[in-house]
A protein has these predicted regions:
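FIC/Doc superfamily catalytic core
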Residues: 1-133
């Protein structure tokens, strides 16, 4: 697989700002280090893991931003939009229904499973709910 187009911290801040302005919530960053960690984890998986297709990388991003609680509010929404944006800039479109998206990201936020299991579950769901642009 060729190296994907990555998101950066400015992209994440922009996504969060837009989410809060459109759908409400408390603005603010809880921990900038968690944002960097969530961004770097996907790159680490790409460079050092055999399981690094675009869907798994999107799931790593989604998991990181949902579970790391980087922001005061909007973490699930940021996680979803990071997945959507990352897929989009790499030639894929998430086509799941709004109800499915809400269910999957709410379940992810509440999950107590292992990180590896949750990422694989999310990656499989993304794989089944995308199409090339």
């Amino acid at each position: 697989m060729t190296e994907p187009v990555w998101l950066n911290a400015a992209d994440i801040y922009s996504i969060h700002k837009k989410i809060i302005s459109v759908s409400g919530g408390k603005p603010g960053i809880l921990d900038g280090g968690r944002i960097a960690s969530s961004l770097n984890k996907a790159k680490n998986v790409f460079y050092y893991s055999e399981n690094s297709d675009i869907f798994n990388l999107a799931a790593v991003y989604g998991y990181g931003f949902v579970k790391n609680h980087c922001f005061m509010d909007g973490n699930k929404r940021v996680g979803l939009m990071v997945v959507y944006t990352f897929l989009g800039i790499n030639g894929w479109e998430l086509i799941a229904s709004n109800n499915d998206v809400v269910k999957v990201f709410s379940e992810l936020a509440a999950s107590q499973g292992s990180q590896a299991m949750e990422i694989e579950t999310l990656a499989q769901w993304i794989r089944e709910n995308t199409r090339p642009i």
